[in-house]
């Protein structure tokens, strides 16, 4: 029943969401690459190696371009798999006991896992990893108990599946080893060293296979990912880590943060009120006190929990941190879904520990204890649902949704009106910024849309997307001007064996520029345009007096024009070079 309720909440979150940032990058890549090519599957996606996520995303995007329905369905299905795998792991550790509901409730409703679920690109990484994490932990415990080799095989396969979606899944065998060893330690009378040795011996087949997979994946990762992205800013990493505890993890123990802020195009970040932060610390203190008073041998369990809370975040902060990094990065909470699962599994291990023989009687099983536990669980769920609802309100404040809806309608109308191509251009920076180039180009984002004009590097009718996604008439701004040519009544003259150098009235810095070129041609054909420093762009020409707009990447103080067709002669006049703006 709890899983069904969770799926209802997550379905509402999924279907009321929309594409955001990396989702649009995935759309652009799926529209411009072969889905089975190594360059697509093993692309360095901002430090991630995720062929499984690329393949799933690409297949869905190809089947229904820019349709949010199927990404939302995948979110719910993947969440179901992750939740069922966690339930299996809790059952393996605790059995079908009512106490199982305590850690399960925390895992299913904790707001700490919500941001990583709502963002499709992030969920394609984390949810398969969470399913693999729970499954491998359960298999490791069962292998240690029964010695059945099939658990070594299924555990290794599940681990490989997690790696295919997220390189962070490399933590899975280490978490599984820790959970199995701690369960062995708290359930018996061995010391911790003996429990570790027994865990290695009993699960050796799984551990050796997992280490081999880990080594191979590390080699692949190092070969794919640009290692220069790593930072050595330990001070900023420490500040991010501290902020994740004070504004994320600790308030999350009480169902916080309750409140979120957002400045587009950033994703929401947690801004818990002081009361929620204080409540989180009280909950943490109470859980530590009650667990220590009730259970024996759980010191290593708590140390492991704290250690993982630090270790699971340090690599990502080392990769993301710099002097310009905002501390709000740690408050987005999207790096914490695996921590929720690990804390849940460790809680199950702690609940398996023997009670203290001289423990407090009010902690013994009774109707009163059951009522108090149920009441606290209801309060936690209510607090968590409130945090989830406020997150959703912030998450839905996304400029991509109206922009893409308007753009799709505008593209369809433009296609119906004429066959004139659209000049390729960047989409609005609140939707996708230049740092994502070339996926921020309209030709990439809308590559799979069928009902649209072609995108081209040149056009005779200049139009642009305005900030709302509508197509409007456009002009070229006068950043620089083509100086009038030397030939009377012609300007600049170009033939196949006689290129023309069109001087500008000043230099251009490196950028994607647009030129308005007025020309007179004697026949159909094409010409090649290029800045002093930049690639050549092929532009079609037509006989007579015409005007063409072309997108020219590069820099320099002149434009070179080469006639690209035999017997083609061109006269070229002055015009602006700059950016496109509404007319």
At which residue positions do the language-model features occur?
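Intrinsically disordered, polar/acidic, low-complexity terminal segments
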Residues: 2-43, 47-51, 57, 61-69, ...
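Membrane-embedded glycan-lipid processing machinery
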Residues: 17, 45, 49, 70-77, ...
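Transmembrane alpha-helical segments of multipass membrane enzymes and assembly factors
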Residues: 76-79, 85-102, 108, 120, ...
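Membrane-embedded helix bundles of polyisoprenyl
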Residues: 98-117, 124-135, 151-159
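Short hydrophobic alpha-helices at membrane interfaces in multi-pass membrane enzymes
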Residues: 142-160, 165
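Perimembrane helix-loop-helix junctions
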Residues: 172-215, 219
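Transmembrane alpha-helix segments characteristic
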Residues: 296-324, 377-380
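Hydrophobic/aromatic-rich transmembrane helices and adjacent perimembrane loops
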Residues: 323-355
